[in-house]
Amino acid sequence: MGMLSPLQTLTKYWGFNSFLSSQEEIINEVLSGRDTLALLPTGGGKSICFQVPSIMLDGICLVVSPLIALIKDQVSSLQAKGIKAMALTSGMTLSEVDIALDNCIYGDFKFLYLSPERLQNKMVHERLKKMHINLIAVDEAHCISEWGYDFRPAYLKISEIRSFIEAPLIALTATATPDVVKDIQKKLLF
């Protein structure tokens, strides 16, 4: 593990001197290796809840996110801070995906972003097995629930990677009823 504390990591990369609401508690849960559900309002700093601990830990964080625009924003933001992050987006050729995954295995990337649909690819599975994944972050986790308003079937298959990736999982969402929370935890194998 790195030498910096969560707060020092936050200050170094984001320039903030304190955490918002329950961020620090969530980060400590993640650092202790527990599966965690982060229920924070929009603008509540959900991404910091997985980015800070992943920077502190050896290895790479696998981030599953449904929105290409959000993925591109987060990757650009991390890169601007000098943090190595990349995304597998739908516009990439098989060869580009192949090269990107190799870079994640042999390079010192900290974040790999991809959609739940891209995560279903067998080649992606094979390459993930070769990576030292420190955390699985599932953004917009309410999309896993059939109770939710923007259900995405590919989200139901995210838990399959837990059979070959031994890493804690953090599920993040701004909106979840108690039923949706239970559903998220069940479907992600908490």
Model regions and ranges:
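Conserved pre-motif I regulatory segment
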Residues: 2-41
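Pre-Walker A (Motif I) flank of P-loop NTPase domains
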Residues: 32-38, 59-61, 108-110, 167
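Walker A/P-loop
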Residues: 33-52, 62-65, 173-176
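Conserved helix/coil segment N-terminal to the catalytic DExD/H
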Residues: 44, 51, 92-135, 145-149
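Motif I (Walker A/P-loop) of helicase-class P-loop NTPases
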Residues: 45-58, 71, 154
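Conserved nucleic-acid-binding Ia/Ib motif block in the N-terminal RecA-like helicase ATPase lobe
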Residues: 61-63, 68-114, 183
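Conserved nucleotide-binding/hydrolysis micro-motifs of P-loop NTPases
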Residues: 68-70, 92-94, 118-120, 142-143, ...
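Post-DEXD/H (motif II) to motif III coupling segment of the RecA-like Helicase ATP-binding lobe
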Residues: 129-190
